[in-house]
From Swiss-Prot:
GO terms for molecular function: DNA binding; excinuclease ABC activity. Interacts with UvrB in an incision complex. Keywords: Cytoplasm, DNA damage, DNA excision, DNA repair, Excision nuclease, SOS response. Coiled coil: none annotated. It is found in: Cytoplasm. Belongs to the UvrC family. This is UvrABC system protein C. Its main location: cytoplasm. NCBIfam families: uvrC. One of its GO terms (cellular component) is cytoplasm.
Amino acid sequence: MQSETLLETLQNLPDQSGVYHYFDSRSKLLYVGKAKSLKKRVKSYFQFTPTLAPSPKLSPRIHKMISEAAFIRYIVVENEHDALILENSLIKQLKPKYNILLRDDKTYPYIYFDENESFPRLEITRKILPHKGVRYFGPYTTGARELLESLYELLPLVQKKGCLKAQKACLFYQIHRCLAPCESKISKERYGEIFKEALGLLQNHSKLISRLKERMEKLAENLRFEEAGELRDRIEKIKRIEAFSGIDLARLEDLDILAIATSGKHSMLTRLFMREGKVVSSTSTPLKAQEGLDEEEAYRRAILHYYDSFMPLPPKQILLPLELESKRELEAHLEGLFGRKIPLHHPKQGSKKALIDLALKNAEELLRLEGEKEEIPLLESLQELLGLESLPRRIEAFDTSHLRGEACVGAMVVYEEGFCKESYRRYALEGRDEYSQMREMLGRRAEAFDRESPPDLWLLDGGLGQIRLAQEIIESLGANVEIIAIAKEKIDAKAHRAKGAAKDILRTPTEEIRLLPSDKRLQLLQKIRDEVHRFAITYHRQQKLKKDRQIDLLEIKGIKKGKLKRLLDFFGSFEAIREASFEELCKVVSEGEARAILEASF
């Protein structure tokens, strides 16, 4: 701790609301916090002895953070609410070492229908819709698609969004899956009765499962075993939603229940979603915190992290197993988001206390199962081997691909308890060499940290040069992402990708690590590297094929390769050539060739 630097800052702190950042001696971000008064809050971390020292009142985690702190930076804002918003945004983007971090869960789907429609349909959305008269059901952490498919299979609802516009009965009418309201073959009143039945099944999963089982048995009797098997799998997924639906409140309340279980260094947050008196779904996520968990801060972070104005069906109340000191400011924040009060309630008895107990029980069980996962010891061993500050639960790997500078592309894959294919990203790159391509790709990924939070670890295909390049990008943003690389050892000054030709070498910012081929840690990183290489190659081939087709088409139109090269050099891409005007094309080719290009569909 550099006392002079810190002391100078502490003596000049303003008595205003703001957000403060602690950094270590290497300018690495340690912690982000907010304050009603920067002067009072930041000073509370210290005791002013002859040498500046951490306050004895601090938790072990924050005490350790202060002992590593070298300097402080701060941002002044208008009020405490603005400080709260900015703090939450910066923690999501920068992932400071000592803040409590939550995984970015995807937005959960809701099932909805529009009450204004004469013949309504059930559909899925992940965000609030702009018009009035929309009724939502959910959120569903699993099984939303299966619920919808089941209802459309069991009942003759309007199957597709565009059906009514067609004004003509389609195939669904012929196979008895729709009653053709488009041709007025069913009245609005009769359709309303069928739709009411669908809503009843949507809200009573036991009854829905019973109907699906009857259909499954009929399919099996008719030797339609494949369809019966698909229905069986769908029933199993709906049963997972059903797991909590036996819990019922006498009043039809909309509640969210949050609970955190902690064991040693590991913590688990569980959320139960109750709508109209029934628990409709649940989700859990591990929490990351260096040197122990502060429960007050953890619940505050969870509320700020998971509740935003795009939520279609916010709860009427949030239940917590403790009374939060920051309750008033959080309730004011929620009221600002949703335009109504959402109380944070700590029930001490009754049915709501039972819901808290249930959430805690689930958090404890999931934490136990998390500790038993085979991958956790492997990740802990990898953390120790690579000298990482946190467990590498979420790993992003990058690779580029091109053929002599053509169809330059990049790819990113994500590994978190397996490959997360919905998080994969592809990049069309403009750089002509591997370093500029990697810089462009990593820069674009880093710029998206505000929308998609940073991972624990970046895995690059290369060596120290690639690591330093990535470090520049991360440090320029002040984010916390650890970086390693993997590459084939060089034989005759060449790196051989072919399997068996050379061993893989791991590289951290400070050392080179060689492991036996049988080492599970190496095999995990190789598996991730091979997946991103496959993903990049596949995208490159698609782009190359597209480009070859464009070249072939233009050659058919009489544009020779020499002219094509001049066009690409001048415009930069086929997209730019396609969008160019006749006058712009004539700067490079003849008028006849310009007309041929404008007529070509490439």
